[in-house]
Amino acid sequence: MWTIMIGSKNRAKVHALQEVVIRDKIIVRSEAVPSDVASQPFSDQETIQGAINRANHCLSFDGVDYGVGLEGGVVRSEYGLFLCNWGALVSQTGDQWVAGGARVPLPQEVAHELEGGKELGDIMESLTKNPDVRMTDGAIGYLTDGEISRKAMFQHVVHLLIGQARRDGHLLRTVTH
């Protein structure tokens, strides 16, 4: 049995991991750990680094076999600002896997506020009038009119991470699905 720690107490992120590994003999723990990047990552590189940093911080806790970091950010393109999300899975043996997920263009008014220094989560709270939006639908829920939740978006990334690890002989299933 393995223990995986996710470097966040955010319910959307924690539940994303729990629901992906629920049928496996894996213990999921969560702790708030720093990303060591800006509170609003503004590139793929910074968002990836935040996810890797969170995952690595998890390995410093006793009894943790694998660490997971999930990080949301924004990225500039010739088509405007896009929402991005990245994840990292690291093992105590030094292995590391990285995966990214959905990209959705941000409305011009949201991009303008981001460029002015606001955090996406704060902007979404204001737009949705939901102080809990980071734990529920997130920006992706707003941008897709509820078709995709933040949890579902991060579940996709977790599936990509776990799948890569299993391909490499880690976290092999111990129960039949």
Swiss-Prot record:
Catalytic reaction list: XTP + H2O = XDP + phosphate + H(+); ITP + H2O = IDP + phosphate + H(+)
InterPro entries tied to this protein: ITPase-like_fam (IPR029001), Non_canon_purine_NTPase (IPR002786), NTPase/PRRC1 (IPR026533), YjjX_NTPase (IPR050299)
Keywords: Hydrolase, Magnesium, Manganese, Metal-binding, Nucleotide metabolism, Nucleotide-binding
Names of required cofactors: Mg(2+); Mn(2+)
EC annotation from Swiss-Prot or TrEMBL: 3.6.1.73
A Pfam family recorded for this sequence: NTPase_I-T
Enzyme class label: hydrolase
Cofactor binding description: Binds 1 divalent metal cation per subunit; can use either Mg(2+) or Mn(2+).
Record NCBIfam families: PRK03114.1
Free-text function comment from the UniProt entry: Phosphatase that hydrolyzes non-canonical purine nucleotides such as XTP and ITP to their respective diphosphate derivatives. Probably excludes non-canonical purines from DNA/RNA precursor pool, thus preventing their incorporation into DNA/RNA and avoiding chromosomal lesions.
Family: Belongs to the YjjX NTPase family.
Assembly description: Homodimer.
Protein name as catalogued: Probable inosine/xanthosine triphosphatase
Biological source species: Halalkalibacterium halodurans (strain ATCC BAA-125 / DSM 18197 / FERM 7344 / JCM 9153 / C-125) (Bacillus halodurans)
Lineage of origin: Bacteria, Bacillati, Bacillota, Bacilli, Bacillales
